[in-house]
Amino acid sequence: MPNIIYIDGKYSNYEDSKIHVNDRGYHFGDAVYEVIVFNKKIFYDFDSHIERLFNSLKSLEINFSFSISSLKLIIKNLIKMNRANIGSVYIQVSRGISERNHSYYGLNIKPILTIIITKKSNIDINVKGVRAITL
């Protein structure tokens, strides 16, 4: 289980972190996520995952202002804080917090970035996965 996560601009203890009840990701699944595996602090296909994250955010018209370099810095800090050598990085960007309403057009909503590091004892890259369709 992760110890330190990054949520809405702050590093926080996993047990103390909270998601606002009016987060659109909570109500409507109005969010994008990516999972990146790392082994000995080397990321598996980092650029492709980040490119897909940004493409998905753009497709959903989520106005995300973080740069790739700032995301990578946060991720590296979390890996160090959690003393993880092998594991996965879960990145989620929700549209943000607003009153419960199906429409988000015309609202000034700040996206919420959450990053969680999950430590693993071993990752077998030869395990057969499943097919998925991505944007």
What are these regions (language model features)?
Residues 1-135:
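Conserved alpha/beta cores of soluble small-molecule-handling proteins
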